[in-house]
UniProtKB/Swiss-Prot annotation:
Highest taxon listed in the record's lineage: Eukaryota
Functional description taken from the UniProt entry: Probable ATPase of unknown function. Its presence in a non-photosynthetic plant (Epifagus virginiana) and experiments in tobacco indicate that it has an essential function which is probably not related to photosynthesis.
Protein known as: Protein Ycf2
Chief place where the protein resides: plastid
Record field: compositional bias (Basic and acidic residues): 316-328
Protein family per UniProt: Belongs to the Ycf2 family.
Gene: ycf2
Amino acid sequence: EFESTILGPSVPDLVALTNEALSISITQKKSIIDTTTIRYALHRKTWDLEADRNLSPAKEHGTLFYQVGRAFAHTVLLRNCSIDPISIYIKKNLCEAGDSSLYKWYFELGTSMKKLTILLYLLTCSAGSIAQDLLSPPGPDEQNLITSYGLVENDSDLVHGLSDIVHGLLELEGALVGSSPTEEEVEGTEEEVEGTEEEVEGTEEEVEGTEEEVEGTEDEEVEGTEEEVEGTEEEVEGTEEEVEGTEEEVEGTEEEVEGTEDEEVEGTEEEVEGTEEEVEGTEEEVEGTEEEVEGTEEEVEGTEEEVEGTEEEVEGTEKDSSQFDNDRVTLLLRPKPRNPLDIQRLIYQHQKYESELEEDDDDDEDVFAPQKMLEDLFSELVWSPRIWHPWDFLLDCEAEIPAEEIPEEEDELPEDALETEVAVWGVEEEGEADDEEDVLLEAQQEDELLEEEDEELDEEEDELDEEEEEPKEEEDELHEEEEEEEEEEEEEDELQENDSEFFRVKPIIPRHRWIFRKKKDVFEVLSYPEEATEISKELLRLLNPKTKRDAPKRPRQRWWTKKKQDKHYELLLDRQRWLITKRSLSKSNGFFRSNTPSESYQYLSNLFLSNRRLLDQMTKTFFRKMAFPG
């Protein structure tokens, strides 16, 4: 059936076709490769595969580059690590309190500067972004696909936060452990191991000498014991000879001789038995000495095992150093460990400064008293050389108050109103009647002008009501009405200018007897300096109004709001504490925080480029898996 099909001239083409058919059958979950599958595989191998590859969504490349960078970093740098930090970052539930293995792993990771650099960027998925930059740089209109996948919510904040953590770990390491092990320390460790081996050899020589002494002691004691036994036997033989001579000489006294023989023989036997017991005791001592020699040999063997373990540790340290020192990658420089005395001095200065601030606050309570601040405020604002425009206040008051309710006698005013008048306006009692008459005349003139204006407005309104019946003239009437209103506003402005010229002549502004009829207001002052500028602008607008609307509608309207002064002191203290903390940390942490991301990125980029062959192999593998899933 496939006779017309022309395959490649080599075996790899047939193998590729077989792999293609297998991948299609696995994808379609078929247990048997039929002719349709082979035809489809041949079709895919015959035609260009670019169109088929373009069928996959473009967003999968972000995940692909992330997987490539993660696998590469894990293969090259984290071969001996049992936990993947990227998985910990994505699955935050793994980081639970009380996990001793996780804590131990992170503690070991925190004691190495090189692994800290790796951890910093593995947690921020920089390995994937670096792989994406190296393999396919994004265009100007493309976005960061890795960030769009939600793996990192805010990369910059996380980088800076991890930089602070790394900096704290480095300071802790510098204070507790010191600098990282170098080649000199490794050489010193080797010298210590060699010295330990020499001590072990000397111990072996001592053990050999002890064995020789034990052997010599055994030989000497055994030989001496044998000589004593032989001498005892000779004595026994001599005694027997003497006994025989005694028998020959004294034949008549056999009973005595027998009794003597029995006594002497028994005594000699007891001596021989005692000598044998001494020999047995000597043999037991020799056995105990042999046991001590065996224990010494076991100690020597244990010492040799410790020496071998120390040599293995030294070899492992050399391997760890060579694993990173031979990759020609720029490393981060370790900051110098800080002196504990400097830290104590900084804490002492901070506490001393806080105590001084609290003492100053206690002393300044009288300075910031409300009455004192009230007097200072009026001395600066009220008596400042400004041009005042109080006609708006007067006109408002006269328009709202009927003439019948105005008191005729000055005695009706309360005493506190008079005190407020003198304190605020600074008007002396002399010449008050003349000033009041002038003010009343001016007010009457202004009332007449206002009445005339009101009459004119009423007449105009009547005319407009009559003309509303004509629909064609509505637009013209509206236009005329606007013009008339503008003219009225101009007339009012002219009147105000004339009044301002009148008031400029007088050095002291007269008071109005009705303004302070009621009790004086308690002026409450803001305690926040941030709002001082806004209050000053508001005061200028109220005291020098451009239009009538800007002026306060009531004479009792408050210009200040009440705030607690305690909050102001707390804000000052918090501000000073924040400044002290910022100054202390900016010197040591600013340089590290600003340079760590760029140096770490450069480190991993150089590492990727130095292992470009492995990176290409991983990239091809992931592309093949994406093109042929299953």
